Amino acid sequence: MVEFASKNDENELKAIWKTVFKDTDFFIDLYFKYNFIPNNTLIFRIEGKIVSMLFMRSYEFHFWGKTVLCYYLSGLATLSKFRRQNIMNQLINVSTKIMRERNIPLAILIHANRRVFRFYQKFDFIQVFDKDQEQIPLERLIDSHNSLLESYAEFDSIYREKDFCIQKDFTDFQVIIKEWENEQRLIKTNVAGMAKIVAPHFLFNLYRQKTGNNFELNFEKEDRIILKDNVLTVSNRSLCRLLFGYHTSRLVPKIAALFPEHKPILNLMLE
């Protein structure tokens, strides 16, 4: 059954992480030190043994000029022996229920490949972040300042005013630099990722407040976009694409004019 983890589960969770993701002990210890929060970690036990896990981490996210909370989902893993039993489906569904209960309007994750991309689509996730080759200037930020706090101040100034971007605090920045230094200052860029709208009417109202567009929402399962008689008919995934402005210039002009194209940014998530 799905339950919250406890602090006593940490070593077992680390072992699963090592088995599934093959990360170094340094990375695993760093991740758990700053990201393992028992009541934000879901596990599935069979005969007392943890066989699957999902981590949720709260971040501030800029969305249509407002700051909202999102949950970043990571470490989604099931031991190979227990896959194809719908265990991860249960963890993701429970995580969505928890987000609704906690008034978290948005979920974000990074998909490792096309197979898991298709899997997450079943749960209303859609790609809204693109990978690119633009280098994040960590080396310049570190080498041009006298303290890490000064480096963070400039880092924060780069992203603080950007819409559709996760905000990192100073502790996050310290962790980012520790991982980056351990990786021999490996070049970092923006990564591809997916989002899921958990509170569609709340987020749509932020869009309406910012733009003054006042049409109503109507939901259907099919991924199409129809605007007729002041009613926007969409799926949850389609609405997510529109609100993020993800390649909206490719849509019909009437829709593209209402939802201008943006460049959502996702990076430095201990991915």
Give residue spans per PLM region:
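Long, hydrophobic, well-ordered secondary-structure blocks that form the structural core
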Residues: L106-P137
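Conserved acetyl-CoA-binding loop-helix of GNAT-fold acetyltransferases
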Residues: T78, R84-K97, K122
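C-terminal functional modules
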Residues: G193-E271
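Amide-forming acyltransferase catalytic core, primarily the GNAT-like/NAT-type
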Residues: I126-N213
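Conserved GNAT acetyl-CoA-binding A-motif
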Residues: I92, M99-A112
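A glycine-centered beta-loop-beta connector
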Residues: R45-K49, L186-N190, A256
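Short hydrophobic/aromatic beta-strand element in the GNAT-like acyltransferase core
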Residues: N39-I43, M53, G75, Q184-K188, ...
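Short amphipathic alpha-helix that is part of the acyltransferase structural core
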Residues: M1-S58, G65-V68, Y72, L138-F170
